[in-house]
Amino acid sequence: GCGGERDKKKRLTMGKIAKKYCRKIFVTDDNPRNENPKKIRNSIMKGCKKIAVEIGNRKKAIKIAIKELGPNEILLVAGKGHEKIQDYGNKIINFSDKKIIKEIIHKKKFSSKKNHYQNFLLKKVFDNNNLRNVNYNNVSINTKTIKKNDLFFAIRGKKTDGHKFAREAIKKGAIKSIISKKIKQLSKNKIIKVKNTFSSLNDLAKATRDSTSAQIIGITGSVGKTTLKNLIGFALKNYGKVYQSPHSYNNKFGVPLSLSNLKRNTEYGIFEIGMDKKGEIDNLSKIVKPETAIITNISGAHFKNFNTLTDIAKAKAEIIDNILDGGNIILNKDDKFFNFLSNKARKKKIKIISFSSKKKADIFLLKTRKVKNCYRLKIIVNKRIFYFDTMYSTNNFINNILACISVLSVLNLDLNKMGKKFINFTIPSGRGDIKMVNKFKKRFKFIDESYNANPLSMLSAIRNMNYYKRKNNSQKLVFLGDMLELGKKSKKFHKELSTLINRSDIDKVFVYGKYIRETFNSLVKNKKGKIFNNLKEAYDHFSKIVHNNDLLMVKGSNATGLNQFSKNIKKGQISAI
């Protein structure tokens, strides 16, 4: 409001300023004095018509504004905080903004209502009158994961239509099914009808992101995203409430689904962002809007849709465009695209934090040494020395440790707290976890890299075999599958693997797949194991040739079936190493 009999020119200006910075404005009376209150309000309204509501009664205006206030939003009640009266010229009213606000908040107790947050989010997304007390717990697009009071989105995918499962979701306890077409035998109070369920899921993700006060971290790169996400989540749990995207939920469905499940009390949110083609990271990071982003590395993981590594680097760099103002980008200084990525970040005025396991950087590895049953890493963080103990010493994992420490440093957290904590971190299954297994009436070391494969991760896994120590005369055996989605460069990349294998101390290489035969055919004779036609043949063969204390490593793209093969091997696991 504006006072009467005061500077009239400022009224329009106040309306314009409010419109620039606020999502909603309530224009009410200040001290009209002897002026017409309606005319004063009209002068302000001219500057902010589309998003302003005119309510002359100041108490009513404050009450409605508080009622509509969402989580983490600020309500500015301006003009009369210092006064205890309202002047209408011929009438003086006892009135205190402070007193009125305290009374309304005390009666409403909105901050402690569990369902206020969810209702606020749903009302931002859906134009629906049937949204009172929709106290949903989680958001799901898969009835296999539905629990009581979850919100189910019926998404149409390539293989199936979620609408087929909308009734099943309700039977399993879903509070609402979001649908875009009529479904028989589903009551109106159990549905929210929309034009497009996928768009609505994205809208809920955006509303959730815009309403959180959590520090949001986005991770992309060609290799190591999921392990790094888990590692950062593991570390941040020592400092506050953490939410991280589950599994490898990094595509156009997984990212908005993960964001929609971000809880109100979360302090740190960690999201993995993947891609298959140009523009995907841009679209997904626009939803995530990270304060801090990490690009782990650039490699030929997507040549099916890209011609060069530079094209892949440009696509990964899209995340930089969507880092919030004043945000940070954490980059691997050992990656050959470091300068390219850092140049883009500088142009965007994004702060760059570098890490390295080979050279000086903001955060870099100085030394690794074996200490009893673990490895002690001496790491320089912004010119200060810190020590961290871990169970793993492979280059991949050390890079993940460095990236994780970079995040902790950016957030100004006490690094000494993590000195001994990394020992308890377990690498996710299929991403380099090491187990001692009892299988085929033998006890041997099993290195599971079977979740996925691209040229960089494959070379790294092969290189790591040189660091694993033999016990007595044990064998080092490798079982490799195809690296998929490499397009025209597939033959070249598969053949190049043989150069590294031939120089390694791997004893025998076994393969299964179409493209990996290029690798096998280029191996020196004494390293050639066998080409398998199916996985049963592979299973039967390993049951005969694996001995006690041998090392067996399995790696290939997920679609090859090697991940399931590895799960069958690990059914007899004893313990992690």
What spans do the regions from the language model cover?
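ATP-dependent carboxylate-amine ligase
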Residues: G1-R132, T145-L151, G157-K164, E291, ...
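Short, basic phosphate-binding NTP loop
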Residues: S112-G218, T227-N238, S260, Y387, ...
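Residue-level signal for inorganic ion chemistry
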Residues: I25, V77, D150, A169, ...
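Short, polar loop motifs at secondary-structure junctions
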Residues: S177-Q185, K333-K336, S357-K358, G513-R517, ...
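Non-catalytic positions within long, well-ordered alpha-helices that form the structural scaffold/packing
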Residues: A166-K171, S285-K286, N502
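Phosphate-binding loop of NTP-binding sites
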Residues: K109, H116-D127, F198-K333, F337-I350, ...
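Acidic-glycine-rich active-site phosphate/pyrophosphate-binding loop
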Residues: L228-I232, K367-F386, D433-I434
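Short gly/ser/thr-rich secondary-structure transition/capping motifs
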Residues: K8, K59-K60, N130-V139, S199-N202, ...
